[in-house]
Amino acid sequence: MQLFICPEFQVSGNQLIIKRNPELIQQLRKVLRAQMGYQFAVQAPEATERYFLRLQKRSDQELQAEIVQMLPAPSKAPKTWMLLSLPNKQEKLELIIQKFTEIGVDEIYLWASERSVLKGINPNKLQRLSKIMQEATEQSWNRSLPKLTFIEAPQSLHQERKFIVFDLPSTQQHTTSSKASALPLLGVVGPEGGLTERDYQSFPDGFERASLWESVLRMETAAIIWAWKLKNLKN
């Protein structure tokens, strides 16, 4: 069964109506070749109700479907936040964003660290990343679409967040008490080559530092592993 993330729809009785979403309607018609009675699921980008539907009527501008089942909104869970240093290639960024979404990261912040090759994200690339997140959410059946934001400096995230910095192996001591922390956790992933001293100066006092022992991984590999670890640490 196909899940669609739909920002706007109407519920009337046991019917759900979708308007002004030509991309979704075209996908049902031309890609899935859906006939009347076709079953699919729809949810909003936020963690709200999920509707299981049976197609009843369809035109070029609108579709109507019978609500077969409604799953209530999930209970609120601690959020997973990741701060990602921009990698050296757009392809790596797209892969990491896709996997963060599949893992269930709630909010993703992009940032140009001192060693970042990419220093910013133009609107077209942000739009492409948003599309990748939507497709990954639909594929993984996650309950909400991550929020994606580019920030100029980590200082804007200091308030009420516990920074866990994932970097190259270090002799610096770090604690392992994150699970008991009362503050929401924010994982930080540096670029290949590691974070610089100036980067570290931009983090709040009391941040923790962690590494994958002696392993030196590609940035995209490390980012995926750490996002999964942080998600499971919180849950």
Give the location of each predicted region.
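RNA substrate-binding interface of SAM-dependent RNA methyltransferases
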Residues: 72-162
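Fold-independent oxyanion-binding glycine-rich loops
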Residues: 7-8, 45, 86, 151, ...
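N-terminal positively charged helical leader segments and presequences
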Residues: 1-72
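Structured adenosyl-cofactor binding patch, chiefly the S-adenosyl-L-methionine
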Residues: 197-235
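Active-site/ligand-binding-proximal alpha/beta "capping" segment
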Residues: 161-201, 205-212
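Hydrophobic side chains in well-ordered alpha-helices
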Residues: 28, 92-96, 199
